[in-house]
């Protein structure tokens, strides 16, 4: 096949037909200059990372020659920087040895360079896209050429990824001509223009659907024809499903992903999208007026526009990350959907027919019928509670519950909300509401409606679902996307070359000083202007406005002059001035601010308000001046380009989604509700706003429910439900997670610094000796018998050993370390301060005013910090710590000598005072060790602490009971004898006595162990003071004083955090250690809120006023009264001209509060709709009169959502990761930690080791086979079971309910049979060892019993709910049936400890704030957002309301309800007679809870899940090849050694077990082909004896082929055998050093993995590595010593044996002794002694094992680095010092010297407990070594090395 071109392809050397491929299947790097920066040599299949290497608009003229290539005919080509990649489909062609000369897609010239390249990358073939340079470009600048290349590259990305052209197997008519058309650049440009035109036409049609709809429809049909022709052209050239390049069999196999893909049309994802869109387009054209279901196809046709997402390289990279995360994302979403389905089924059974009951007002005479919208469960009738009425008006047969309607109204069944589309009546509606819960927005209204219709406890299902589904499982979705995107960011970051930044200095020193010092002056002008803008109001007088204007003009001209002066300061290097971005920004701001002073702008308040942003933007200089904000801002904006690309991606996605929504929901019929009809998708702009609203999750359910209601009559309500749900899931959970990933990357350290950061953190832990919780013992400590903290001394030599160069080098994997490696671990969170910063000046002032206190923790930090600044390295870290402590102790002694009264309590009570010593015997010191005192009696102290804890718990319970309403009711009757008042007095007295004892024991504030030095004591003292003040106010009836201080009593609940150590640590990590970072994030957020608030005040100040009468047009008409119709009742009311009740922008504080609420993604839609209705000053708002104003809030909401919410999440994730150390873990270390967690959780198989026979053996197979027919059958039954559960609905016919219950009974019987089969096959013992089996028994028998009872007519509501719950629990068996679900479930379980500790801390805060809210607002009247259960009048209501505010659900509306004041409430003289709110307390408490719970703890929850999930999906480790089958194989090998499934085997069997392992765990020294039997069978002569002889004499009767034997021996690698023997020696020795006579399953698995698979140098964190290095060094010493002693013992035995033989010879030569008497006369030989000790013969000796006792000390990795499950999680439960401590011998023992051993022989080492047998097959020997190594270690090592060489040399001799 040939093609006509300028250069005949037949002239090529091979005279081979060329194929102009769109995807060249050969490497074309041969014709590209190697200096070309656009070439990437490591392209993967469909890898578009090369796009990151093409940096647009950074073009170097010098590189023009590298980007231009010439062909043989002189045609010039320009490099586009786009590689063409295809899969391995061309391997078939390469095997056929077909030549691949091709032409460029943009020229017919033969590219001979393709013949030279044959390099592939991972089996893929890549080339470089080029375009033919027109002749006109020679006249233009190369910059224009590069710019054109970037534009054309964008065109190619949108049109589609370049693919290969027709394959050699196709030869169709007209293909050359069509190929030329397809290869022409104008064709690509034309297709790009068509796609853009399609988007424009759709937007125009949506904005004007009536006038131009017919014309645009015709144009869209034309575009559809063009799309179809393009598709047919591709199909003709490439084939539809089969391209003909290979056999049809290979084509079928290509779908298995094991063989390369073909070039056919549908084998590429973008072509499949195009095909679906084109087919949907023609279906929508056929449909009549695009109504009904045809709307769906019209929407699908818009998917062709998704190609616009490839417009830039970065957006294409984002798509790539989404594609890479698609598989785990689908798995996680499926896992979440499974649990969502389970809860949806429960929702149907629990809450069916609950939302169709409302209170109906009947009127005074029963002649009215007005549904009130209040859900109910009964009504009052003549003072008696009655059940609700059914739809026919008859009473129901259920008990009244929930909200009881008032008199003259009834609770009656009506239609479900939103045209019967919102309910729990069937599975699909229930599943929709469950997803609403998972979205964490819009579910609280449904929850309170259910609580009104049912019982209060109904909220538990919503609370559990919200925490489990939303915070726990949905966090996995965020973790998948974030992990994938972070990995992509790191890969791109590693590929980028660091650009060198030239630091130019100003030559004139005077100018440099001027720039530095004058900066403060100019910033003061900026601050003054900013403050002035804040004080300016919209209603100021004209004279005031002129003064403000004059001031603004002066400041603007001064700052403009400052820019000019700054420019002259840079001279003569004026270019340096323009290289600084701040200078360029200041120039632009100066010019624009001068422009705003023009009269035409100044006199227009709207334009002046919008342009005031340029004056406000100068505040950035203040942000950069403060070190705190500058550091965070730099981290935040360090990846600013990536954030902009993400914003571009988000905008494009929003635009396409808006067009799709318009095509679906434009011109929908109204359902009659005016509120729902206001939601319209009539235009693209409206659709854009609604789609963005759903993205932010703010009231997104209102949009979905309203559209569903309008489509309900067409039975198409499922379309908006599915559409909006998918859009919410993609936009809110996927796209926004990418912003978190971008910001988080900025906070993460580089890969090269991770291990060094671990070292720094490790030293920081060593030096940190301050514990803020030391004042109180935890509950765990109180229940222990011995609670004294015994100091454990650590030998200094161990520290020296830890910091040896070889240890540090081994961890860092470097060969050279500087002699003094600077290491400055951070003991505090304060950043580095600049020389003239305010914080630095403040610290200096404090040091000048306050004297140094050597007893404070800050003093120790400062001392060690000075040492670090001078000279600090890894070796001297421990010595520096000890020196600093000694120095501080000396300073403390000197300080007390100089200030003898310092340790006297109140300068009176001396340390020797008896009362003080008595008090010291009762309590522990607040901080540090007690100086100059006595230690407390432990039991007395414990009793006191238990009593105090009991008092705290009792006080909390009383506070939950004695609410303000309860107190008011009792105080009105008897104020003097109210029991709760006197209990408060009693508790206050007890806590006062406790504080007094502590103060007398250790002092109040200035003594070494003062009371107020402890954080918790400060909180206790503050609570105690407020408690007495509140008691005084209550007893004296001081209302204002009582209300001001009564909330502080809730702080005592914080003492409950001390109940567990994990909650202590979690509280410390969340609120204390990360306080500074969170505060910094808050400051940075404020720098964003404040400028926007000021801008909003200038733009919208005074424009939100409106009249409550919609019929007036201006403020002048808003007078007198009008007929108001609340609840359809006409009432005359006065007209009022006012702002909205909860927000306005008239003052700066009001604007700041409004924007803070918007930043929490709450309430911004209402504010946006208000500003969209603005018509002008003093004019009545009109709907969408100023719709463009909405973009202000869209912009602010997007920026705040990205830079505030994601900033908080990223900082909290970073802080938690740094505290736990996971932030500095490498990929290998993360994988190891995950593997360690897996191993610790593994248990032996719960089944017999030997398969029974007969029928029981068959049952055994059914029980143990993972993929057998029996298991698959029951998996199918579980799926059928789940499908029948989905058929529960209301109203359901009784007959179908009976049939369904019968089916469930049959299934339960099948499950019971399955249990019986398992029990019979495994036996009771093994069956009940499994948790799943016990769970199966309980659930199956419970469901069977319930089914029988229900079918036997014993049905009631409680039994039905129990039956459904048990049936739903049966479906849990599907989780272990699928590997993905099983793995994700283990991820969830792995995070349980951290989650529970977080929840425990969270619950304490819940109770604290619930009591505070109840004490302050327990009597406040209900507002518009309140309800029967939505209030703070009881603790349970307060807890539920706090739960809703945790998810941001209407927290701002509730807050404004509790700011109510007089005259809208009753403000009585007494607290109990007032129902007003409290504005300071409302703002303080609500905002504090919003920040602590919503911003911190919710993100901590996500962080914990993310931290565990990242370990599961780590794929870059060297031991990820461990599969589930490998662990199963290990369990199978374990089973024969542990037949009773105890999880332990004796140590004497450990070596046999290790040698029995196969596969990846194989520890045999010689493999199967090199065993003795295998070698004998191969070397025996054919004429000799063919059977293998007995092992006692293997060569007897055989003829050996010595030549074959030599060949086999030559194949044995001596080094490999030596390495295997060393590994086996080390493993067995470490096993024997473990304490006890048995070893557990997890411990031996851990040791096997450590010795065989894991490289501790790469995989271990620093603490584990140090411990492991010590263990290995001790093992090496032990093994060397064993070899030495073995040699000595062998020598002695040989000498004894020779003496024995000599004596025997002499005895035989003696003629007076008979031969039979020789054995009786001669002494017993050492070998016979050994055999006698073991009661064995020589044959048994070969199989015997021994238990070497290398040392009485246990230094195994199992006991240190990897603790048992009971001990916790390594470093989390133990201090770092514990990892460094090596156990010492408790009992002294005799330690013979090496000289004694060598002179006296091995008899000096033997004892009665010595076991000297050894395993010949294992090839190692050990002996007891009870002496210290001392200084003879080097000699021993040299001797052992010689022994090794001798043994290795002799082992293979001959």
Curated annotation (Swiss-Prot):
Question: What biological processes does GO assign it?
Answer: calcium ion import across plasma membrane
Q: Does the keyword Ligase apply?
A: no
Glycosylation: which residues? 40, 310, 699, 786, 1058, 1184, 1356, 1508, 1773
The source's superkingdom equals Eukaryota
| Compositionally biased intervals (Low complexity) | 1-15
User: Which GO terms of the molecular function aspect are on file?
Assistant: stretch-activated, monoatomic cation-selective, calcium channel activity; voltage-gated calcium channel activity
The transmembrane segments are 184-204, 220-240, 274-294, 328-348, 427-447, 461-481, 514-534, 549-569, 581-601, 606-626, 642-662, 723-743, 946-966, 980-1000, 1021-1041, 1075-1095, 1148-1168, 1193-1213, 1274-1294, 1302-1322, 1331-1351, 1358-1378, 1393-1413, 1486-1506
What are the protein's UniProt keywords? Calcium, Calcium channel, Calcium transport, Cell membrane, Glycoprotein, Ion channel, Ion transport, Membrane, Transmembrane, Transmembrane helix, Transport, Voltage-gated channel
Membrane topology qualifier: Multi-pass membrane protein
Per the record, its GO cellular-component terms are: voltage-gated calcium channel complex
Residue segments, region Disordered? 1-33, 1764-1792
Tell me yes or no: is Transport among this UniProt entry's keywords. Answer: yes
| Chain intervals with Basic and acidic residues compositional bias | 1771-1790
Xref: InterPro entries: Ion_trans_dom (IPR005821), VDCC_alpha-1_subunit (IPR050599), VDCCAlpha1 (IPR002077), Volt_channel_dom_sf (IPR027359)
Location in the cell reads: Cell membrane
Subunit structure as annotated in this protein's UniProt entry: Interacts with yam8 to form a Ca(2+) influx channel.
Task: Give the UniProt family note.
Answer: Belongs to the calcium channel alpha-1 subunit (TC 1.A.1.11) family.
Q: According to its UniProt entry, what is the function of this protein?
A: Voltage-gated, high-affinity calcium channel that functions together with yam8 to mediate calcium entry into cells. Required during conditions of environmental stress.
Q: What is this protein called?
A: Calcium-channel protein cch1
The organism encoding this protein is Schizosaccharomyces pombe (strain 972 / ATCC 24843)
- State which gene encodes it: cch1
């Amino acid at each position: 096949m040939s093609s006509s071109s300028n250069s005949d392809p037949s002239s090529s050397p091979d005279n081979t037909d060329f194929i102009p491929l769109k995807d060249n299947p050969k490497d074309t790097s041969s014709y590209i200059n190697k200096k070309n920066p656009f070439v990437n040599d490591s392209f993967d299949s469909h890898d578009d990372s090369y796009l990151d290497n093409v940096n647009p608009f950074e073009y170097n003229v010098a590189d023009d020659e590298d980007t231009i290539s010439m062909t043989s005919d002189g045609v010039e080509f320009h490099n586009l920087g786009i590689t063409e990649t295809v899969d391995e489909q061309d391997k078939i062609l390469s095997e056929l040895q077909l030549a691949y000369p091709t032409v460029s897609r943009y020229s017919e010239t033969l590219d001979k360079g393709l013949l030279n390249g044959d390099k592939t990358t991972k089996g893929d073939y890549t080339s470089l896209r080029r375009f033919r340079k027109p002749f006109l470009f020679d006249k233009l600048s190369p910059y224009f050429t590069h710019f054109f290349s970037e534009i054309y590259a964008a065109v190619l990305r949108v049109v589609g990824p370049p693919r290969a052209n027709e394959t050699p197997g196709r030869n169709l008519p007209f293909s050359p001509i069509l190929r030329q058309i397809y290869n022409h650049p104008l064709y690509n440009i034309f297709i790009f223009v068509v796609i853009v035109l399609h988007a424009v036409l759709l937007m125009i049609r949506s904005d004007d659907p009536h006038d131009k709809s017919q014309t645009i429809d015709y144009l869209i049909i034309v575009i559809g024809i063009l799309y179809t022709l393009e598709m047919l052209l591709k199909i003709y050239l490439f084939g539809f499903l089969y391209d003909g390049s290979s056999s049809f069999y290979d084509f079928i196999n290509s779908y298995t992903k094991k063989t390369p893909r073909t070039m056919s049309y549908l084998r590429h994802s973008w072509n499949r999208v195009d095909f679906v869109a084109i087919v949907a387009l023609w279906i929508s054209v056929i449909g009549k007026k695009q109504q009904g279901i045809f709307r769906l196809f019209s929407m699908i046709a818009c998917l062709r526009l998704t190609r616009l997402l490839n417009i830039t390289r970065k957006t294409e990279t984002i798509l790539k990350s989404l594609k890479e995360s698609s598989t785990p994302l689908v798995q996680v979403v499926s896992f979440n959907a499974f649990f969502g389905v389970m809860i949806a089924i429960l929702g149907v059974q629990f809450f069916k027919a609950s939302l169709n009951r409302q209170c109906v007002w009947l009127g005074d005479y029963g002649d009215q019928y007005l549904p009130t919208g209040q859900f109910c469960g009964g009504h009052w009738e003549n003072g008696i509670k009655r059940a609700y009425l059914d739809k026919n008006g008859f009473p129901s047969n259920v008990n009244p519950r929930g909200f009881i309607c008032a008199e003259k109204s009834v609770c009656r069944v009506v239609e479900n909300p939103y045209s019967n589309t919102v309910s729990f009546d069937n599975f699909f509606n229930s599943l929709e509401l469950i997803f609403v819960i998972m979205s964490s927005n819009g579910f609280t209204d449904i929850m309170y409606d259910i609580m009104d219709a049912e019982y209060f406890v109904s909220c538990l299902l919503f609370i559990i679902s919200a925490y489990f589904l939303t915070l726990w499982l949905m966090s996995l979705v965020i973790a998948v996307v974030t992990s994938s995107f972070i990995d992509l960011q790191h890969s791109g970051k590693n590929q980028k070359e660091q650009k060198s930044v030239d630091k130019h200095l100003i030559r004139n020193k005077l100018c440099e000083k001027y720039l530095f010092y004058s900066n403060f002056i100019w910033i003061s002008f900026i601050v003054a202007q900013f403050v002035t803008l804040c004080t300016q109001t919209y209603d100021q007088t004209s004279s005031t406005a002129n003064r403000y204007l004059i001031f603004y003009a002066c400041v603007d001209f001064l700052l403009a002059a400052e820019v000019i002066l700054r420019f002259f300061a840079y001279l003569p290097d004026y270019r340096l001035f323009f290289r600084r971005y701040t200078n360029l920004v200041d120039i632009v701001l100066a010019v624009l601010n001068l422009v705003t002073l023009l009269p035409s702008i100044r006199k227009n308040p709207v334009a002046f308000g919008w342009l005031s942003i340029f004056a406000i933007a100068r505040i950035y200089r203040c942000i950069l001046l403060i070190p705190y904000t500058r550091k965070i801002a730099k981290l935040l904006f360090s990846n600013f380009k990536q954030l902009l690309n993400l914003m571009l991606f988000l905008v494009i996605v929003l635009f396409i989604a808006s067009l799709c929504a318009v095509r679906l929901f434009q011109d929908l019929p109204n359902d009659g509700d005016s509120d729902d009809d206001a939601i319209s998708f009539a235009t693209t702009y409206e659709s854009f706003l609604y789609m963005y609203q759903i993205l932010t999750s703010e009231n997104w359910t209102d949009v979905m429910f309203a559209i569903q209601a309008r489509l309900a009559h067409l039975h198409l309500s499922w379309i908006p439900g599915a559409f909006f749900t998918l859009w919410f899931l993609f936009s809110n959970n996927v796209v926004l997670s990418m912003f978190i990933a971008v910001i988080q990357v900025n906070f993460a350290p580089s890969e090269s610094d991770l291990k060094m950061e671990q070292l720094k953190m490790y030293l920081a832990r060593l030096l940190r000796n301050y514990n803020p919780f030391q004042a109180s013992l935890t509950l765990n400590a109180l229940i222990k018998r011995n609670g004294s903290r015994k100091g454990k001394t650590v030998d200094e030599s161990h520290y020296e050993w830890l910091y040896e160069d070889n240890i540090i080098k081994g961890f860092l994997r470097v060969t050279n370390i500087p002699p003094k490696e600077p290491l400055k671990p951070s003991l505090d969170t304060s950043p580095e301060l600049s020389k003239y910063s305010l914080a630095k000046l403040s610290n200096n002032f404090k040091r000048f005013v306050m004297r140094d206190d050597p007893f404070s923790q800050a003093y120790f930090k400062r001392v060690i910090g000075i040492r670090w600044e001078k000279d600090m390295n890894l070796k001297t870290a421990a010595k520096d710590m000890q020196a600093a402590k000694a120095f501080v102790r000396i300073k403390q002694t000197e300080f007390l000598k100089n200030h003898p009264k310092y340790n006297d309590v109140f300068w009176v009570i001396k340390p020797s005072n008896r009362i003080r010593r008595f008090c010291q015997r009762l309590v522990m010191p607040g901080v540090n060790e007690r100086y100059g005192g006595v230690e407390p009696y432990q039991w007395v102290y414990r009793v006191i602490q238990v009593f105090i804890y009991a008092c705290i718990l009792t006080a909390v319970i009383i506070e939950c009971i004695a609410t303000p309403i309860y107190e008011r009711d009792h105080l009105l009757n008897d104020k003097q004898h109210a029991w709760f008042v006197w209990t408060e007095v009693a508790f206050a007295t007890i806590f006062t006595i406790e504080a007094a004892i502590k103060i007398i024991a250790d002092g109040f504030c200035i003594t070494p162990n003062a009371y107020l030095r402890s954080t918790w004591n400060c909180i206790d003292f503050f609570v105690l003071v407020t408690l007495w003040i509140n008691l005084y106010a209550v007893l004296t009836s001081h209302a204002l004083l009582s209300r001001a201080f009564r909330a502080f009593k809730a702080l005592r609940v914080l003492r409950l955090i001390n109940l567990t150590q994990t909650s202590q640590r979690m509280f410390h990590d969340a609120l204390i250690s990360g306080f500074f970072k969170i505060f910094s994030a808050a400051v940075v957020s404020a720098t964003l809120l404040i400028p926007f608030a000021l801008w909003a005040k200038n733009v919208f100040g005074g424009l939100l006023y409106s009249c409550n009468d919609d019929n007036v047009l201006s403020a002048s008409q808003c007078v007198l009264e009008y007929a108001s119709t609340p609840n359809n009742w006409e009432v005359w009311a006065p007209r009022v001209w006012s702002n909205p009740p909860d927000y306005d922008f008239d003052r700066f504080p009001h604007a700041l509060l409004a924007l803070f609420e918007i930043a929490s993604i709450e309430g911004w839609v209402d504010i946006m709709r208000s500003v969209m209705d603005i018509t002008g000053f003093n004019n009545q708002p009109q709907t969408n009169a100023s719709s463009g104003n909405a973009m202000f809030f869209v912009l602010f909401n997007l920026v705040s959502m990205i830079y505030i919410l994601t900033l908080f999440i990223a900082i909290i994730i970073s802080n938690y990761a740094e505290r736990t150390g996971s932030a500095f873990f490498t990929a290998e270390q993360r994988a190891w930690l995950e593997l360690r967690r897996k191993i610790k959780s593994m248990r032996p198989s719960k089944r017999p080791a030997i398969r029974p026979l007969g029928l029981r053996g068959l049952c055994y197979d059914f029980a143990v086979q993972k993929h057998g027919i029996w298991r698959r059958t029951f998996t199918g039954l579980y799926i059928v079971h789940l499908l029948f559960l989905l058929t529960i609905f209301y109203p359901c016919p009784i007959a179908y309910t009976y049939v369904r219950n019968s089916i469930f009974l049959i299934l339960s019987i099948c499950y019971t049979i399955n249990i019986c089969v398992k029990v019979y096959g495994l036996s009771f013992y093994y069956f009940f060892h499994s948790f799943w089996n016990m769970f199966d028994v309980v659930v199956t028998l419970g469901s069977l019993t319930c089914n029988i009872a229900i079918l036997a007519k014993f049905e009631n509501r409680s039994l039905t709910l129990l039956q459904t719950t048990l049936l739903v629990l049966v479906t849990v068996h599907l989780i272990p049936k699928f590997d993905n679900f099983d793995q994700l479930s283990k991820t969830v379980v792995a995070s349980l400890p951290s989650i529970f500790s977080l929840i425990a801390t969270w619950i304490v805060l819940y109770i604290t704030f619930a009591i505070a809210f109840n004490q302050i607002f327990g009597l406040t009247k209900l507002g518009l957002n309140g309800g029967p259960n939505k209030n703070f009048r009881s603790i349970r209501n307060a807890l539920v309301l706090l739960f809703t505010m945790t998810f941001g659900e209407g927290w701002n509306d509730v807050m404004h309800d509790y700011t109510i004041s007089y005259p809208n409430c009753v403000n009585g003289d007494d607290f109990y007679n007032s129902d007003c709110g409290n504005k300071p307390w409302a703002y303080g408490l609500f905002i504090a809870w919003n920040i602590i719970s919503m911003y911190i703890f919710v993100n901590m929850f996500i962080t914990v899940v993310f931290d565990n999930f990242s370990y599961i999906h780590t794929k870059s480790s060297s031991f990820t090849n461990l599969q589930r089958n490998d662990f199963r194989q290990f369990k199978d090998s374990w089973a024969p050694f542990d037949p009773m499934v105890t999880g332990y085997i004796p140590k004497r069997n450990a070596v046999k077990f290790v040698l029995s392992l196969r596969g990846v765990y194989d520890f045999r020294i010689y493999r199967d082909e090199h065993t003795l039997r295998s070698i004998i069978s191969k070397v025996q002569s054919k004429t000799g004896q063919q059977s293998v002889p007995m092992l006692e004499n293997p060569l007897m009767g055989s003829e050996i082929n010595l030549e074959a034997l030599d060949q086999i021996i030559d194949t044995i690698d001596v080094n490999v055998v030596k390495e295997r023997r060393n590994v086996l020696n080390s493993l067995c020795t470490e096993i024997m050093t473990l304490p006890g006579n048995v070893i557990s399953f997890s411990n031996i698995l851990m040791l096997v993995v450590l010795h065989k698979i894991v490289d501790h140098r790469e995989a271990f964190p620093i603490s584990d590595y140090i411990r492991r290095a010590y263990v290995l060094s001790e093992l090496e010493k032990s093994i060397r010593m064993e070899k030495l002693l073995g040699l000595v013992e062998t020598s002695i035995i040989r000498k004894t044996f020779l003496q024995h033989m000599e004596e025997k010879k002499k005895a035989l030569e003696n003629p007076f002794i008979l031969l039979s008497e020789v054995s009786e006369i001669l002494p017993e030989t050492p070998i016979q002694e050994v055999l006698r000790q073991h009661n064995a013969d020589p044959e048994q000796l070969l199989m015997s094992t021994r238990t070497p006792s290398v040392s009485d000390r246990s230094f195994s990795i199992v006991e240190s680095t990897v603790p048992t499950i009971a001990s916790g999680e390594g470093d989390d439960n133990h201090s770092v010092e514990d990892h460094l401590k090596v156990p010492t011998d408790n009992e002294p023992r005799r330690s013979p010297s090496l000289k004694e051993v060598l002179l006296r022989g091995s008899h000096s080492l033997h004892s009665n407990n010595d076991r000297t047998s050894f395993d010949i097959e294992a090839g190692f020997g050990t002996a007891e070594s009870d002496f210290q190594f001392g200084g003879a270690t080097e000699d021993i090592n040299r001797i052992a090395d010689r022994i090794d060489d001798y043994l290795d040399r002799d082992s293979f001799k001959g």
